[in-house]
Amino acid sequence: MIPRDSYEIIDTLIKQGRSFAIWRIPGEDRLHFRMQSAGSPCLLYDIKDLNERSGFVIAPFQVTAERPIVLIQPDCFEIPSESDWDFSREKNEFPSNEIEIPSESEEKERYAYHFSLFTSPLLKGSQDKLVLSRSKTIRKDPSFSPGKAFFAAEERYIRSDVYLCHTPETGTWMGGTPEILLSGEKGDWQTVALAGTQSLRDGKLPKSWDHKNWREQQLVASYIRRQLSTLGITPEEKGPYSARAGEVSHLKSDFFFSLPNPEKLGDVLQLLHPTPAVCGLPKEEAYHFII
């Protein structure tokens, strides 16, 4: 059991440059922790290289020589206490370099420019879907605690996978998502098609969805069926149904299937990533347009 007042230990592990991850799976109350105390994380340059490997994976949207997949190979499975770890040894792993913080108007102008680039192929019909993400740079408050932020997030977003991870190669990442790329064990596996967004109605899930949201979710569902079929897999399906994520809801379908060779998970991940929910369709054209 990981006590939820361990945020100071998490903050210290980050300052010391440790390679670790802490996360909570949707619907669970138990926190998971993995740390590699000996050696450096493994760097991989192709998703298929995850075949026959295990550990905590930190992967970029685009895998390159400069941005490889980082695999934490844990040898520690519990958060260390102050008594069994040298918490007096702290260092500033990343020098506090000054970075330029763009103004709100500059950020808005930059987003509007990229928005126009993305809408053009959609209006022409050369792309069915493109996902434009937004980044925002803010100045970190000196009192900000990554550990405290993680514990607050995992308590609030009980239906999401909430995580915090750190390595010297990647820096610190924290996030939460209701979308499962792939989950399971041994021969039984699951993925989801999650798309469409609607606000809750008086705290309740909506009972109806418009054509735009239905079409958006079906694009993702059809993609998953096609990708799995290339491996000869015909999954069992549940949905689509309304699923809550924070203060909004999405349309969700579950896909259940068996894998004759679970050690080849890298092959399955390469087929599924990136899904239309985070990239677009057609997959290859959308992927290369974004990068």
Per-range role (PLM):
Residues 2-6, 14-17:
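N-terminal accessory regions of nucleic-acid-interacting proteins
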Residues 57, 125, 182, 222, ...:
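A residue-level signal for conserved active-site and pocket-lining positions in enzyme catalytic cores
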Residues 27-29, 35-139, 144, 231-233:
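Non-catalytic accessory segments adjacent to catalytic cores
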Residues 27, 61-62, 75-76, 186, ...:
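A broadly conserved detector of short glycine/acidic/proline-rich loop/turn motifs that flank catalytic sites
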Residues 131-136, 166-167, 240-244:
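Short, surface-exposed recognition loops or helix-turn segments adjacent to catalytic cores
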Residues 8-10, 115:
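Glycine-rich, flexible loop motifs
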Residues 79-109, 115-116, 139, 192-290:
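Contiguous alpha-helical scaffold segments within structured protein domains
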Residues 14-30, 34, 139-219:
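An anion-binding catalytic pocket shared by soluble metabolic enzymes
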